[in-house]
């Protein structure tokens, strides 16, 4: 449990540095692009799995 608390602390510190450092705008647009890429890949893999079952 303590391990997860430390992991979340490190993630929060990194997010705070990026948020207050001015990189937030660039990283938000990159995250948005990555979200849509992985969403498309998820849908494609889901369709391929359904096609394989039939």
Curated annotation (Swiss-Prot):
InterPro entries per record: DUF1328 (IPR009760)
Residues spanning the membrane: 5-25, 28-48
Gene Ontology cellular component terms for the protein in this record: plasma membrane
Pfam family, one: DUF1328
Topology in the lipid bilayer: Multi-pass membrane protein
Main subcellular localisation: membrane
Keyword terms: Cell membrane, Membrane, Plasmid, Transmembrane, Transmembrane helix
Subcellular location, record wording: Cell membrane
Assigned protein family: Belongs to the UPF0391 family.
Designated name of the protein: UPF0391 membrane protein pRL90066
